[in-house]
């Protein structure tokens, strides 16, 4: 949080990934910064020498999917759950063959294309094809992060009414106008 930061050294832009240290200079890991946010730094890793690159993002996405495969028996689930999956500020739900993404932090918003690309790749390795992605990043908190509210297709448009199966029961979900 902003009140826990003593100083920020070096040049950066909001959304950049920085090394984080405690008051004695001991490395705490890496996180992305946004001085406009009350949560000034969102930690991506507690490992001090980690490089947050495409391979790192793929590892985080793969770990999240591997965990979901052991706990979920449905055509739909929350694939990425922000901080719980060490990808703070982003939630990605799978409704059958459609992904719905909500990005609430500037730093993760910058990584959103890579996260979605790696997620599609990891799912494809298990024979899961994604026909479309819809963004529901329209929460007011985005304004506090210095971002616009966004709602719409990422890529080609598709029918936003999706049939899912949960516990043997079929449901119709409207990813565009339904509950996020």
Name these PLM-found stretches.
Residues 55, 59, 109-117:
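Short, well-ordered alpha-helical segments
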Residues 1-96, 159-161:
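Non-catalytic accessory regions of SAM-dependent methyltransferases
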Residues 42-51, 100-112:
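Short histidine-centered catalytic/ligand-binding loop motif
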Residues 37, 107-108, 179-180:
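Short, surface-exposed beta-strand-loop junctions and turns on beta-sheet-rich folds
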Residues 22, 32, 104, 175-176:
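Short clusters of small/polar residues that mark proteolytic maturation junctions
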Residues 83-87, 91-93, 113-180:
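Non-catalytic substrate-recognition/targeting regions of SAM-dependent transferases
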Residues 27, 99, 170-171:
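Hydrophobic residues embedded in beta-strands of well-ordered beta-sheets
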